[in-house]
Amino acid sequence: GQDSARRISEDARTWLPSGNRISNDRALRFSDNGRFLYFGTTPRRPEKDTTLLEDEIADVEVWTAEDARLYTQRNVQLSDDKKRTYLAVYNTQAGTGRQLASPEMPYEYLPRTANGPWIALYDDRPYAKQTMWEGYPGARNTEIVNLETGERKSMLNGEVTPVRWLEGGKFLVWYNQTDTTWNSYDPAAGTHHVLATNETGVFYDEINDRPMHPRSYGYQGTLKGGNKFLVADRYDLWELDPSARTPAKRLTRGREVDTRYFLRDLDPEDHFIDPTKKQLV
């Protein structure tokens, strides 16, 4: 490593979108391996016109019934909206920066370690009005970005699919509330797999009595190595393979005896589940 500080923000002029600046409204974050530095950018704010008197400054709020967000919700979120930043990254090994998020795809899913080489971005605003009426979580568009090359791949469009990274960052997984399936996406291969359906088991809330799609019984953790993960139904634990090479496997037999099994995490410092060790359920 180097023994002195080096200013890297000067290089931003070569990749930062025109009219944008590096923002101080988002904390800096290094990936666990130190390779990537994440930060936020934002459009430059217009200079305040100091020549106008207070009564010459327009102070009018206009809203309609067609707005995607309620007027009251917009007011509550106004401060956050003003501080909105878009994720960017600096590769400490290559010495290069890259804009990741944008006004068109403003939100991100980062793996816990943020080590890359992929991250996911999403936008739920096109479906905000639908979500307001039907309830959260709402539909969203999702894409993935390669931190090294900048390659982008469209992953999902218009699906009610808040996704999560498996530990290790190899796969994205999610439960689709609309069709009640468990799914995965392999960024490297660009492939989507349906891992469990209603023919496999009943993974949706069986006693849901709300006027909305039923939620799942939950993700339970990633097995050591990052190539398998566990989910629950009402009674049992299941092992799913995000590569879809092996079928879903039920690990317990609680449904037959009306006994519910859920995994208890006794070591929050260990982010993987070691299948060779005893687990508390």
Task: Show which residues each predicted segment covers.
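Beta-propeller folds
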Residues: G1-V281
